[in-house]
């Protein structure tokens, strides 16, 4: 299964309130009708980011996550009426200027076991019908000489024992592209902006601060630095909306 990530910032011609009203009341309703979609979740950046991130503003305002069987299925969707309706709604409200085009990534994920895992599966089986947990997303560009995958395979087990970590996912960004109609290529420009995606889930931003002040957190960041990798980090409030196809998963409160 492939996960598609959309990064959505608030364009200059909309206020935050206007963007949220459109996105939550109109766009997500259209998105639920897209052909072949397996799961759909939306996430919103927290105003208070972890201390080690050291950014005045979050990297992006929202990240939408949508799962399909493969990239070809995504292409079929966005050349169908439902996908074109979603795309058209986005273009007509966000615009098509270069500073408002979303980052789009096709991600193949591997989940690692953690020492303090949540007691339910977050992407299959049962799930909660409300927002919960904080997801720290790390977006990585790889130097040509960096063998991050080999290093990460060795480091993952120690990282998974980080204090307060509830879920740990490592994603490789696919180099595949897709065409929409005759003129649009995804990812925009035909090349993804990032090469890897790390997801580390915690109970709160404060839990993230404690984890990255620990030995494991410092060792992890130092290891990335030695490889010449400087991730872009953003902490998100997870799953304000979660929709699954087919709808055969029991809803828990």
Predicted feature residues:
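Macromolecular interaction modules
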Residues: 1-253
């Amino acid at each position: 299964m492939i996960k598609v990530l959309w990064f959505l910032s608030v364009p200059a011609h909309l206020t935050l309130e206007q963007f949220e009203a459109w996105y939550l009341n109109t766009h997500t309703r259209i998105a639920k009708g897209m052909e072949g979609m397996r799961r759909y979740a939306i996430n919103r950046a927290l105003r208070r980011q972890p201390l080690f991130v050291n950014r005045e503003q979050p990297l992006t305002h929202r990240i939408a996550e949508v799962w399909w069987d493969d990239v070809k299925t995504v292409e079929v969707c966005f050349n169908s009426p439902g996908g074109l309706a979603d795309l058209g709604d986005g273009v007509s409200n966000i615009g098509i200027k270069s500073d408002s085009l979303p980052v789009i990534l096709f991600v193949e994920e591997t989940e690692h076991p953690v020492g303090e895992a949540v007691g339910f599966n977050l992407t299959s089986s049962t799930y909660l019908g409300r927002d919960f947990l904080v997801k720290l997303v790390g977006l990585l560009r790889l130097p040509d000489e960096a063998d991050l995958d080999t290093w990460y395979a060795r480091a993952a087990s120690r990282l998974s024992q980080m204090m307060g970590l509830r879920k740990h996912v490592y994603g490789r960004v696919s180099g595949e592209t897709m065409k929409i109609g005759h003129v649009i290529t995804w990812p925009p420009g035909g090349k993804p902006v990032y090469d890897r995606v790390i997801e580390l889930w915690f109970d709160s931003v404060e839990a993230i601060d404690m984890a990255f002040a620990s030995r494991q957190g410092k060792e992890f960041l130092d290891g990335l630095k030695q490889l010449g990798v400087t991730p872009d980090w953003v902490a998100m409030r997870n799953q304000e909306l979660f929709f699954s196809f087919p709808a055969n998963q029991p809803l828990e409160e």
